[in-house]
A protein has these predicted regions:
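Conserved amphipathic alpha-helix within the SDR
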Residues: 1-15
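Active-site loop immediately N-terminal to the catalytic Tyr-X3-Lys motif
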Residues: 32-33, 81-85
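Active-site helix of classical SDR
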Residues: 55, 90
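SDR active-site lid
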Residues: 103, 107-173
Length: 226
């Protein structure tokens, strides 16, 4: 209902939108076995179901304007990591959703793009680094994959993708190579996890993180109220 209201307000103030970006995202960390089912579901509700609701609210406008819908995905869409099961599942889901939507609306002149983003300097990522298990997740990645990018730089890249109606945009650009080799990632991640997780368990460092960042906590509070 809130998205429908936002779509209506956008039309009244600015006219029919020709570009829509589905960007809302929250994250929790920790083992799946001990995760709170409601918190796990909340991540999927915001990241995946919320993206679908965004598309549903604005799709009539995009059909009228032959517009462009950009779905924000993640490196997690290409390769899942341990301790982030809800986030990885939701980001894999938004990738599949965007591919499906693209196939449905292409003949109507609507373009659908997917943005694959790595670590961005936001409150969510800064908060994640406070938790040993998530900090280890990032620091065990190859050096180029550990780097964070400023939100302004990423936004500029996304604007260029919007202007060109890209079907895919990668930030950083080398994520294209991950796309090509994504089938090789699960065994590599599993091998690394078998080596590192026992040590983290022994250090009692595998507890749940709760919602990450101010945005995640605000989303959690909103979900609790509803």
């Amino acid at each position: 209902a809130a998205l429908a209201d936002a779509a209506g307000e956008t039309r009244r103030r600015l006219g029919k939108p020709s570009v829509v970006v589905a960007n809302a995202g929250v994250a929790h960390g920790g083992p799946f076995a001990t995760s709170d089912p409601a918190e796990w579901r909340r991540v999927v509700d915001v990241n995946l179901t919320g993206s679908a609701h965004t598309a549903r609210a604005f799709l009539p406008d995009l059909l009228d304007t032959a517009g462009y819908h950009l779905q924000i995905a993640s490196l997690a869409s290409l390769g899942a990591a341990p301790m982030m099961s809800a986030y990885c599942a939701s980001k894999a889901g938004v990738e599949a959703f965007a591919h499906s939507l693209r196939a449905e609306v292409a003949h109507r002149g609507v373009a659908v793009g997917i943005a694959y983003l790595n670590w961005i300097d936001t409150d969510m990522i800064r908060d994640a680094d406070r938790h040993p298990v998530l900090r280890e997740l990032r620091t065990h990645m190859p050096p180029p994959a550990r780097r964070t990018f400023s939100a302004d730089d990423v936004a500029a890249r996304l604007v260029r993708a919007l202007e060109r109606r890209r079907s895919a945009v990668y930030v950083p650009g080398w994520l294209r190579l991950v796309q090509l080799g994504r089938a090789s990632l699960p065994p590599v991640v599993a091998r690394l996890s078998r080596r590192e997780l026992p040590r983290l368990e022994a250090e009692d460092a595998l507890g749940p993180t709760g919602p990450l960042g101010e945005g995640g906590r605000a989303g959690h509070a909103a979900g609790t109220r509803t």
